[in-house]
Amino acid sequence: MRARVLTVVLLLLLAGCAFDGGRDDGPVTLRFQSLAWQEESVTANKELVAQWNATHADVKVEYVQGSWDSVHDQLLTSFEGGEAPDVIHDASDDLADFAYGGYLADLTDLLPARLKSDIPSRSWQTTTFGDGVYGVPFLQEPRVLVANASWLKRSGVRIPTPEHPWTWPEFRRITRRLSGDGKYGVAWPLKEPVSATLNLSLSAGGQLFHQDADGRVTVRFEDGDAVVPRTVHDQVGVDRSASPTTLGSGGSDTLPGFFGGRYAMVPLGFSYRQQIVQQAPKGFDWQVLPAPAGADGTAQGVSPQTLSVAQDSRHQKEAAAFIDFLLRPKNMVRLALGDWMLPTGAQALADPALHTSKDDWATGAALAAHLRPAPAQFVRGYPEWKDKVATPAFQEYYSGAIGLGELRERLENDGNLVLARYQR
């Protein structure tokens, strides 16, 4: 009987150690869930984890591979089940519900002054909810125009630069000029139309989500919000300068037509350059151009990639120390190069490797100062609003099935009904 009791006690002690992520007198084990997916990025993350483990005997990190495709639901399930990783890789526009729901630790007093001062305040705004900071924004990318350089040179159009971009009306005129004979000036890959539309609309003064003094958010589709949607709609349905078949496509789906000379330009995230370098036919001449500018210049919204700490983690200080290690300037540069994105940190962004003309890194770096928090950044209920209201409404508008008035009505009326449930 005594042996049986002793066995039960030992099992309970072992279970306690496993739950604790390490014994009091042994090494702590942190679980780091990474969403890196490109080979270079996965390699960089795993090498940094190995470097940490080689130099920290008391705190070991276990690399866990996650997926962007299912991260929100996967994290929600793990939070509710008490099985969340200690260090969480995500994007800032996915954090609001988790932060307000109490699933993420407030990092305000956990992060070192070095890291806080290195990342600009506009980036910290993307992970600040209420009085707390619930993630460290570390990688971001502008949306750019990837262009067939030879085609543009032959046409004689003005080539835009970050200092002198095209305006939205100029962009529309140029895509008309580049079109004809079954070819299009632009191919918009808008399988996921909401974030692209809202983020680019900042250049025209669009905001869409408006917060009152009490923190209540409502949707108002105003003149600035209409500039980008109307441009896309008219390029497709009026000018015939944008391919209608790519509206339901992802960015990668447009590349064969781009390489084949069917589209002069494709609006894509800056990181798509990696696929272009890998897949472009030999001798294909391409270049990166800034997105068009509006009343607010080349401003555009971004939702940076983030690193957070689970509220239920028993080792929050150690997790924050690991994040600080990952985001030292040289390490942040490695992560940025691996993901073909821009670092948020000022020291990392100044690295010469990110200002070279090769693969147009310099063009992207020149746009970094104009990146702002995405309009949907602080909106509770945004995932449901996006999936149930905004995505079908924008898709139908871009295809010509509905007009601008109905788009406005659905975004505002149906959208505010959804958001109201999250603000009771």
Residue ranges and their predicted role:
Residues A50, A54, S155, D234, ...:
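Extracytoplasmic/periplasmic substrate-recognition and gating elements
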Residues P85-D86, L115-W151, I174-R176, G185, ...:
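A structural signal for short loop-to-beta-strand junctions that line the ligand-binding cleft
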Residues R2-D97, F270, A295-D296, K317-E318, ...:
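Conserved N-terminal structural module of periplasmic/extracytoplasmic solute-binding proteins
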Residues Y134-F138, R143, P169-T218, Y263:
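Extracytoplasmic/periplasmic solute-binding protein
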Residues A105-I119, T161-H164, V186, G206-V228, ...:
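Short, solvent-exposed loop/beta-turn-alpha elements that line the ligand-binding surface or hinge
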Residues S92-V144, L200, D285-L289, T356-K358:
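Hinge/lid segment of periplasmic solute-binding proteins
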Residues W286, L337-K388, E396, A420-R424:
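Long, aromatic- and glycine/proline-rich binding clefts that accommodate carbohydrate-like moieties
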Residues T175-R177, D214-L247:
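Glycine-centered hinge/linker elements that transmit conformational signals in sensory
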